[in-house]
């Protein structure tokens, strides 16, 4: 089928002026791959292709849309990034449902760009504080004995990793991940994983010796958080969590200042 651009006939000379000095301009033409992507996305959302069903072959899509193979492949790759199709080597694309990870993943590029701007890290740290504050309050009020045992196990691994910075960072992330798992909401999990990934990637490189003291402080603060959750005291759990994250934020800010002075 032919795909026409609705704005092909516009020209700058014939367009009226708007505002004080602005003249309207022709909008950029869409690529064929973008038009194919949009049409396939609408077909999927209209349930013309159900979840788990295979799309037509590349050759069939080329004939249907009257486009070349590169346009079809670019369109399918874009749909894959949106979580609308799965593509395995040698097989036709199969319709899938976007997961929470897919939704958050679409924001990753924008988030990393935001973090690189002045104040970006501080804003994300505040977001993490608000988010995890709700998580620990929920955990203190609703965590089962089994979930508290998982926190205790994560804490034990934390204690065994104090002298190995790479291992401690992993155990630290795992500890906070267990907190995020307690409500059983996959969106919370996806947000939490992404937040930590973005913040950790933005942290400066620090000498191992400087991190050892920080590891011990974080571990003691983790103990306070778990103790409050075990006592089912949401206010104390919140205070312990806020003390911990404010301490982490201040420590990494100081590390960053030191690193910048050395440059």
From Swiss-Prot:
Q: Which UniProt keywords apply?
A: DNA-binding, Repressor, Transcription, Transcription regulation
Region of interest (Disordered), ranges: 1-22
Q: Which domain of life is it from?
A: Bacteria
Q: What positions does the DNA-binding region cover? A: 58-77
The keyword Repressor is assigned to this record: yes
Its biological purpose is as follows: Transcriptional repressor that controls expression of the genes required for the catabolism of sialic acids.
The molecule here is called HTH-type transcriptional repressor NanR
- Classification lineage: Bacteria, Pseudomonadati, Pseudomonadota, Gammaproteobacteria, Enterobacterales
